[in-house]
Each structure stands twice: as C-alpha cells, then as structure tokens.
Amino acid sequence: MKLRDALESLLEDWRDDISPRWSAVLSGVEPDFAAVDDSLELDPGEVIFPGRRGRAPAGGRPDSCIFRALDSIDPDDVRVVVMGQDPYTHVAQATGRSFEQGDLTDWLGKPRVSPSLQRIIQAVALARTGDRRFTDGAGAWQRLVADLRTGALTIEPSMTLWDGWQAQGVLFVNAIFTFNRFDPRYQFGGHQPLWRPIVRRLLVHLAGRAGRPVAFVAWGGKALDALNGAGVEAAARAAGTWDKTVTLVRGPHPNAPPPGQPPFLHGRDPLGEVNQAVARVGGAPVRW
C-alpha cells in the first residue's frame, strides 16, 4: 500500500480526535495528502504511529494519539510551546507529545531513558532544587537516579509529569505528528509535508493572539527551523505581538549540540530560562 493512501485512511474524520476549540483554530486547513511522495510504500504489516484516539497500535501506550499534544489544553491557555521534531521511532515510546517517552513508568533505568529525556529530567531536578549535582560533571544522571531511589528527590513518572505541564498551558508539539520507519525519505518526503499546513496554522494562531503571553521554545536547529518555517515571528510581528506577548527561547538540543556549542545543561538552567522568557512577556511561570 502507498504511504499516501494509508495516511488518508488513518486520518479519515481526524477532527473527531480534537476538541471543538482546536478544531476551530484549524478550520479550513487539512493535512496535505497530495504533498506525500507517491513513490513511498508501506510494507505488509507496517504500522503508522501514534494511532487514532482509542486505537493505539499494538505495543503503544493506550492513551497515545496522533493529537495527544492538544488534549486537556485550551488554545487560549497555551503559554509555552516546546517544539519537537517528530515522534520517537519506537511505537511503545511515541505518545503524540514532544520529548515524552511512553514506555516509562519511572526514571530508574528500565526501560532506558533516552539521552534527550535524561537531560530534560536533569533540568527538572535543577529547576526544583537548584542543585547542580544533578546536572554537572560525570555521573550527574546516576546521582539523580540514586536520590530518586532513596526518596531524597521526587520526580513524577513521565505521563504524570507531562499531564501536569499540559494542565499549566505547556504545549509539547512536534513538527511531524506521525512516523512509520527510520528513513529520511519517509520522514521528509511523506510525514513532514503532510503535517506542514496543520502545524503552520496552529503555531501562527498561537503567535497572533492578542493579550496571551507565550514563549516558543526551540531546543536545537531543527526546532528553530520548524518555527521559522511556520512563520511564527512573521505572524507575531504582523499581529504586533512579537517581543510584547510573544517571545522565543533558543538553546541547544538536549541530546547533541552542534559542533563548537556548549551542551544543553552546560552552565545553564534551561527551564528557568523558559520561565524568565514567559515573565518578560507578562506570563506566569510554569511549575516544572
């Protein structure tokens, strides 16, 4: 089966999976099926994930959903947008929210916490305690896990943590909502162009709201490219919101900074920087 046909079938009546408020934001825009490379084929039994609401593919977390990022958060309440690239490449890990790893029930090592997520959780520990033992030097992650084991440090499980942030208005959204195989042809010739109109409308809407402070977070060049490609700054400038109620937070990717740039946690407080940016445009800090 062609990838394009499979995506059209998967996304039939896709608005059923989002709230009326988000549906209104996305009024008049559709996934761009015509932009999906017609030469891309799915192998027999190959799965596109995450799935539709209530229809998680085998091995996926039951609540995982293509539109999970939009659950339990009203468009007017978004105050931070954490931009990711695409879903995790394993069905058990992809939830529909950027950076969230779906196969984890704790942070103690099984399954293995992805390197990017390790550093985000280290940033959470720093934001909560101010203790750089959890971020600096060899063995910082091991020190964090050791304190979790003894109860000296408490960090909620992945789903609870992301649910709590989402309830505070933090939108963890990817530039690409679906995935089927680790192959750039499928990623950039199939899934990315499919979702481009949806992502552009969503981000431009958030950038253009009057009186609604929001910080867009770009950790890494690809996240920044996604925001720039959607025209976030241009939309905010046109609406008169740029540097007034809309701002951008840039930083290295949690996993691999570009050559010559410092790592994600090097001398930085990434989540504190987000709260400072939100405060500059009149928003309330996030309880990380």
Question: Over which residues does each language-model region extend?
Answer:
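Charged phosphate-binding loop/patch that engages nucleotide di/tri-phosphates or the phosphate backbone
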Residues: R280-W288
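Short, flexible loop segments at boundaries between secondary-structure elements
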Residues: R237-V281
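Conserved active-site loop/cleft motifs that coordinate metal ions or position small ligands
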Residues: F216-W219, V249-G251
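A polyanion-binding, active-site-adjacent surface
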Residues: K2-A215, G221-N228, A234, A256-P259, ...
